């Protein structure tokens, strides 16, 4: 829902944290959850480590809205579903988030939330959708080769998202 955007953005940033450059993270250099590669694509020019370290929530908020919230049509998703899908999109991609929602709603799975997908999702029970999205997400994460390194943090994150999204639903 449109009115949930600011809260959802803040909750995602809480999980994303600050600057990291973990050697086992395939995303590489990251700050506030934004990878260097994605930030360079967004700005359409190269950035330095100093640029990455200097990122602020105000700087990255439009990036998150354009690249994640808008792509999953967060303004139009039911409350709670918006947060669960948005956090999933940030962590594992907008296509995966859309596909999970489409699968749950029983519509054609193409990875893009269009009018038919949106209508079907809106007819579903929001708490059930949140539960299923989070379960599917954990199943996916547990099968990643990096789960041994990052799994504990991902599990805490998904459990927190599930609890907060369920409260919102």
Task: Tell me what each language-model feature is.
Residues 1-169:
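Cell-wall polysaccharide-cleaving catalytic domain and substrate-binding groove, primarily
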């Amino acid at each position: 829902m449109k009115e949930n955007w600011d809260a959802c953005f803040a909750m995602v940033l809480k999980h994303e944290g600050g600057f990291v450059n973990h050697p086992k993270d395939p995303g590489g250099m990251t700050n506030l959850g934004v990878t260097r590669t994605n930030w360079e694509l967004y700005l359409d020019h190269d950035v330095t480590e100093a640029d990455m370290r200097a990122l602020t929530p105000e700087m990255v908020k439009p990036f998150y809205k354009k690249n994640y919230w808008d792509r999953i049509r967060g303004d139009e998703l039911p409350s709670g579903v918006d947060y669960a899908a948005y956090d999933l999109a940030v962590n594992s991609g907008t296509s995966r988030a859309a596909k999970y929602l489409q699968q749950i709603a029983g519509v054609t799975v193409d990875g893009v939330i269009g009018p038919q997908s949106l209508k079907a999702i809106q007819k579903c029970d929001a708490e059930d959708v949140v539960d299923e999205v989070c379960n599917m997400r954990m199943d996916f994460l547990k099968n990643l080769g990096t789960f041994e390194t990052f799994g504990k943090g991902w599990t805490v994150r998904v459990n927190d998202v599930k609890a907060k999204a369920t409260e919102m639903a």
